[in-house]
Regions:
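Claisen-condensing/thiolase-fold acyl-transfer catalytic domains that form or cleave C-C bonds
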Residues: 1-74
């Protein structure tokens, strides 16, 4: 989840993916824990950020080094 902006920025740098490719809503809601991906997905969909045929990667990680990811083609 988007616990803080530093995590998103670090991931952007480590994966060499431009920060503008990340959808971040921390400034609006803060840390929403497990709800962060569904909330961000809903906002991005309503804003028509995803284009048909594009890939979207949703990654979540939390305590105990647990993580999960899903790759979606729109």
């Amino acid at each position: 989840h988007q616990a803080n902006a530093r995590i998103v920025e670090s991931l952007s740098q480590r994966l060499d993916i431009p920060l503008d490719k990340f959808f971040c809503n921390l400034d609006k809601y803060g840390n929403t824990s497990a709800a962060s991906i569904p909330i961000a997905f809903d906002e991005a969909t309503k804003a028509s950020i995803f284009k048909q045929g594009e890939l979207g990667l949703f990654v979540a990680f939390g305590a105990g080094l647990t993580w999960s990811a899903i790759l979606v083609r729109f």
